[in-house]
Amino acid sequence: MMTRFLATTLATVVLSGILMGCGASDDGSIRQSTSSEGAADHLTDAFANADSESKKNAGIASEAIRKGQFQKALYAIETIKKKPEVDFDQGVAINDSLINLERELIYRAEDGDKKAIAAYELLKRINRN
């Protein structure tokens, strides 16, 4: 229980730090999700007008997040991240998704979910690159 609290707190602090360093959108606010599902929506919205490949990968990632297919989501997000055309709002959506995924994976890994443990290891590798 304490580990979950610490993980959630850490994820919140990291997200706040990232967002404070990134600036804000036109209306002065930055969208932050409080769940994996919200992050999936954020990703879809941010890439609605992107190039077809990025939009497709954002859709794949969002759907995979909703279905709990976390490795698939991470691969799609990693593909998007590598594109040089990612704008500010899209970058925020990517970070929002990764932070919410990390929190979800930690919760599931603590409960012994082997797929979550494998996905968390993948997330750590992605974050190193």
Question: Model-found features: residue ranges?
Answer:
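Bacterial N-terminal signal peptides that target proteins for export
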Residues: 1-10
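C-terminal motif of bacterial Sec signal peptides marking the signal peptidase cleavage site
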Residues: 17-21
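Bacterial signal peptide processing site
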Residues: 22-26
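Short solvent-exposed coil/turn linkers within tandem alpha-helical repeat scaffolds
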Residues: 28-34, 48, 83-91, 123-129
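Post-signal-peptide N-terminal segment of Sec-exported extracytoplasmic proteins
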Residues: 38-79
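Short, charge-rich amphipathic alpha-helical segments embedded
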Residues: 75-103
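Alpha-helical linker/edge segments of TPR/alpha-solenoid repeat scaffolds
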Residues: 98-128
